[in-house]
Amino acid sequence: MKYAAFLPTIGALVSQAIAIGVQGTAEGFASSVTGGGSATPVYPSTTDELVSYLGDSEARVIVLTKTFDFTGTEGTTTATGCAPWGTASGCQVAINKDNWCTNYQSSAPSVSVTYDNAGSLGITVNSNKSLIGEGTSGVIKGKGLRIVSGAKNIIIQNIAITDINPKYVWGGDAITINQADLVWVDHVTTARIGRQHYVLGTEASNRITLSNNYIDGESDYSATCDNHHYWNIYLDGSSDKVTLKGNYLYKTSGRAPKVQGNTYLHAVNNYWNDNSNHAFEIGDGAYVLAEGNLFSDVTAAVESSSFTGELFGSASASSTCQSYIGRDCVANSFSSSGTLSGSNVDVLSKFKGETVASASAAGTSPASSAGQGHL
């Protein structure tokens, strides 16, 4: 009888062990990513331990079971910044990072800024890592992640990254990717971020998939002074291939995303809801295939004044895509929103022979399926 009493406990532990790991597989450009593979899961208990696991040279599956709060761990800085968007209580102000205020906003009012140093630079993530959250428990607060300088084969799934100096532009980014390859970010929630939720820098980042993520733009501070975050997704790489699928972008006001450099972007089945300014900025060197997306209460689906790149996407299905990606393109949908349209076949030619994500009809499902806790 004593042995029998232990059986449920053993069974529960076995079930938990089986459940710990990456769920599903990436679609699109990062479809061959494996992350930490079958490495034995590790469970950091301190911020130092988390930093160590992410930054070492071992293949790892790293499981977050609690909040790792970096706020205050590196002290604070008080300095003079600027207020380019005004001094009202709901406006972001800027840190004078690299003399940005001095060189580019010399006419803006000067203001005192006090920011948390930990947010300024994210945690380095080295190659062959899977960083996953357990349920809704895995949170990194006050500091982001940096996947840079040749890092590759990385999966980030089912975590939240929050509260990185939200009042301050240049206060820090949630996820930075630069000169990387095979990165899959899936079911991640980002909220109350000072600068970009996602930024792909000017170096080439070859195969990236951002899927089923919740970009929560609601904030007490914004550059548009209206509780809608302006700095959301910035894709600026010299040779980037990015799949953006199934994401929910809520209460944004710009750069959602901003695409330029030499970036191939497949934006498919995303849901933009309550955007007070514009979603896409499509600049020089951007090739954007947009299909099956829903824009609801979005003032402008694409900013016309900065539109110098290439776009294929419309409100009707297109058989033109068949000879390039092996299927028809799916119509975008618009509700109380500005529209986007483009029929540049040069865009489709960039995707020929590439691993392209599937597409379904536009809808609101990302609102309930994207982000942490919705695997």
UniProtKB/Swiss-Prot annotation:
Q: Supply the alphabetized keyword list.
A: Carbohydrate metabolism, Cell wall biogenesis/degradation, Disulfide bond, Glycoprotein, Lyase, Polysaccharide degradation, Secreted, Signal
Recorded catalytic reaction(s): these are: Eliminative cleavage of (1->4)-alpha-D-galacturonan methyl ester to give oligosaccharides with 4-deoxy-6-O-methyl-alpha-D-galact-4-enuronosyl groups at their non-reducing ends
Query: Superkingdom of this entry's organism?
Result: Eukaryota
Q: Which residues form the active site?
A: R255
Give the intrachain disulfide bonds.
Answer: C82-C101, C91-C225, C321-C329
InterPro entries xrefs: Pec_lyase, Pectin_lyas_fold, Pectin_lyase_fold/virulence, PEL
Q: Which GO biological-process labels does this protein carry? A: cell wall organization; pectin catabolic process
Which N-terminal stretch is annotated as signal sequence?
1-19
Enzymatic class: lyase
Q: Which family does it belong to?
A: Belongs to the polysaccharide lyase 1 family.
The name under which this protein is listed is: Probable pectin lyase B
Q: Which organism does this record belong to?
A: Aspergillus fumigatus (strain CBS 144.89 / FGSC A1163 / CEA10)
What gene is this protein a product of?
A: pelB
